[in-house]
From Swiss-Prot:
The gene is FOXL1. This is Forkhead box protein L1. InterPro entries: FH_FOXL1, Fork_head_dom, FOX_domain-containing, TF_fork_head_CS_1, TF_fork_head_CS_2, WH-like_DNA-bd_sf, WH_DNA-bd_sf. Gene3D superfamilies: Winged helix-like DNA-binding domain superfamily/Winged helix DNA-binding domain. GO terms for molecular function: DNA binding; DNA binding, bending; DNA-binding transcription factor activity; DNA-binding transcription factor activity, RNA polymerase II-specific; RNA polymerase II cis-regulatory region sequence-specific DNA binding; sequence-specific DNA binding. Residues 136-289 are annotated as: Disordered. Residues 48-139 bind DNA. Transmembrane segments: none annotated.
Length: 345
């Protein structure tokens, strides 16, 4: 413990020093060293940079002036007198002082009056910026830029023109003779195969030619004639400019009639009927007066019984297409048509 209180211990060569800066007094060192030690340490160490921005330094110089205005050289002299750090490298920080004076709105340049001695204009503080300095420091505020008078008006015409162009597009589509919506419907329709030309007719149970009674044949023929007449009247009433309608709408009764047969009725009819004659085997349809369109497509000899009968009806309104192809096709007899119907262009 004796070496801690030994008087021969060397004294501290340089004690830590703290400088307090202010606008009214120079740096005041706080230390408990002799004056000689303070002088030696001050020469050896460079002075500390004051914790103030250039804007705060300029504001201090302006407020310290008697008329609250000072020239550029007066600002330089005030800074060098109060803060020893700025004695060196004058060119660097003086450029920064000029830069802040010209770009900051808080500093206002006042021209010198005529006849007043000296040269250079004065710099003063804007009265609206006095509250931006707290304890000598400049408090930056983020000012929201005020929109110009023409900014909102410039945006409104753009929105209005965009809305008008959007409204003009449906009007242009509807004004073209009504063809726009029709074209859009045709384009939006699925490109599926036609039920008349491409797709086969709905399947129906097989019906042997010999099982049909004369009463059933007469009723089926009447229903088929009415269906064909209604279909032709609907197609001719539309006119040449109307779109083609599917002809399958005119034969719902015949399809329902053909679907009404079941396997039990076929088996019961086969047990109660006798084998048909040769005339029924060849045609499957009774010959009528004047000759009729719709001869049997499949012929068989007298010794063989055809498994089914097929009839073909041509549609005069659809070129190259068939009205209906059914296997079997015994729901109605083929109708007698004039020769002009079979004349295709």
């Amino acid at each position: 413990m004796s070496h801690l209180f030994d008087p021969r211990l060397p004294a501290l060569a340089a004690s830590p020093m703290l400088y307090l800066y202010g606008p009214e007094r120079p740096g005041l060192p706080l230390a408990f060293a002799p004056a000689a030690a303070l002088a030696a340490s001050g020469r050896a160490e460079t002075p500390q940079k004051p914790p103030y921005s250039y804007i705060a330094l300029i504001a201090m110089a302006i407020q310290d002036a008697p008329e609250q205005r000072v020239t550029l050289n007066g600002i330089y002299q005030f800074i060098m007198d109060r803060f020893p750090f700025y004695h060196d490298n004058r060119q660097g920080w003086q450029n920064s002082i000029r830069h802040n004076l010209s770009l900051n709105d808080c500093f206002v340049k006042v021209p010198r009056e005529k006849g007043r001695p000296g040269k250079g204009s004065y710099w003063t503080l804007d009265p609206r910026c006095l509250d931006m300095f707290e304890n000598g420091n400049y408090r930056r505020r983020k000012r929201k830029p005020k929109p110009g008078p023409g900014a909102p008006e410039a945006k409104r015409p753009r929105a209005e023109t965009h809305q008008r162009s959007a409204e003009a597009q449906p009007e242009a589509g509807s004004g073209a003779g009504g063809s726009g919506p029709a074209i859009s419907r045709l384009q939006a329709a699925p490109a599926g195969p036609s039920p008349l030309l491409d797709g086969p007719s709905p399947p129906a149970p097989l019906h042997w030619p010999g099982t049909a009674s004369p009463n059933e044949d007469a009723g089926d023929a009447a229903q088929g004639a009415a269906a064909v007449a209604v279909g032709q009247a609907a197609r001719t009433g539309d006119g040449p400019g109307s779109p083609l309608r599917p002809a399958s709408r005119s034969s719902p009764k015949s399809s329902d009639k053909s679907k009404s047969f079941s396997i039990d009725s076929i088996l019961a009819g086969k047990q109660g009927q006798k084998p048909p004659s040769g005339d029924e085997l060849l045609g499957g349809a009774k010959p009528g007066p004047g000759g009729r369109l719709g001869a049997s497509l499949l012929a068989a000899s007298s010794s063989l019984r055809p498994p089914f009968n097929a009839s073909l009806m041509l549609d005069p309104h659809v070129q190259g297409g068939f009205y209906q192809l059914g296997i079997p096709f015994l729901s109605y007899f083929p109708l007698q048509v004039p020769d002009t119907v079979l004349h295709f262009q």
